[in-house]
Amino acid sequence: MAFTLQAEAAEAPQPLFSGEVSSSAVQAMHPFPEHEQYQAGTIKPNYVSQNQLDDEVRKKYNEWKTRYLKKHPKKSDQYYVFYNLEKEAAPDNAVSCSEGHGYGMLISALMAGYDPQAKDYFDGLYRFYKAHPSVNNPALMAWQQIKTGAGDIIDTPPSNSDDGSRSATDGDMDIAYALLLADKQWGSSGPIDYLSEGKAAIAAIMKEDVNQQKWSLKFGDWVENNDPDYGLATRPSDFMLSHLRAFGNAAGDPNWAKVADNTYGIIQTISTKYSPTTGLLPDFVVWSNGGYAPSPPNLLETDRDGYFSWNAARVPWRVPVDYLLSGDTRALNQTKLTNAWISKKTNGNPSKIVAGYKLNGDPLDDNDPAIAYSAPFAVSAMLDSSNQNWLNTLWKSIVNAPTSSNSYYGNSIRLLCMITISGNWWDPTDASN
């Protein structure tokens, strides 16, 4: 089925505040659009031109930035990603989390060259990250911030039901990867040594977020290795294999390959044993009876913890990126299986993708489509040329979904997936970069 798209020219990025003057004088060395050469045989949407793909990214970036990227109300040199605009997070006065902060730092580094203020935003986000260190390791970020009645932004205190003073692995990993991108984008000879900061974050992740008994990724720096519930548990949405590869390259640490090997092993175990017809991974995985298994209900969040739900929705984006960039085939079968299943399940109609599934493919929420699910499936569709019509349909669906009709989570994931699908995600540790 062919589609036509009348792509409007993206508006130039606008300052967040009237009269704001960019201090960035450093030229981007990898300006958007980067047009990375992905693994041979992978595909992009082909019913539109490359310029139209890039232009859709520009437009969604402008909308995302205007909606979510905010200047600190009391510290003009800091920025944060306002992840609670739609009031979906608790407590009500929550304003920032390390997950969203990592997204913001990735996006700012990747959109440099298009947005002349990208370095200003990145540096402001960096300063906010450094102003909110985890209580367990200052190279990692406290996972949640709230705004007080006086207008100050502080870490959610331990007295709250959710202790925001400790780290979460996904935010830690994205922040570290973003710092590596920044080093290649602007160099590290300026006021911020991005490379040294990135290496410090990588070392902290290895020390605090990795259980080195199994070389598994933990939920965050708050998990003790010997914790009977969480010590060997892991979260598949943290399975950022290309990040792990980059961390090993940047740090010169072969232990990152052990983490990647174990992570690929978990993907293989779960998809073969628990989701052989769908390839779906659950929100959380535990070590049980000598092997990895889907989490029981309410391990960490909800009764959906053992299903493909709001956390695991990111897996079809996170995992395939390693194949796109490196050609590692270890998750290829699982990714292709999941993509073939969802395409057949929906009869090729992205609007029928719902917000969560049991591992056998039964839907959790009928009639509840969500961009946070459909956008990652578009990334996984890139891995096989037989998916061309399906990828075209997915791309049309995700670019046409209004930003105003979606929340921070879906809009952020959508933008990062669009950057990837358009050929503009890259590895800062690749020698060619």
Model-derived segments and their meaning:
Residues M1-E8:
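C-terminal segment of classical bacterial N-terminal signal peptides
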Residues G19-R67, K71, A94-S98, A131-W143, ...:
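Extended ligand-binding clefts on enzyme/binding-domain cores
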Residues K70-S96:
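Asp/Glu-centered strand-loop micro-motifs enriched in Gly/Pro and often flanked by an aromatic residue
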Residues N93-G104, T156-W186:
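Aromatic-rich carbohydrate-recognition surfaces in CAZymes
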Residues M105-Y114, A381:
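Alpha-helical support elements that line or immediately flank enzyme active sites
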Residues A112-G113, D183-G187, G248, Y323, ...:
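Short coil/turn linking the two alpha-helices of tandem helical-hairpin repeats
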Residues K119-R127, P133, A168-A178, W186, ...:
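Outer membrane beta-barrel
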Residues S351-N433:
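C-terminal functional modules
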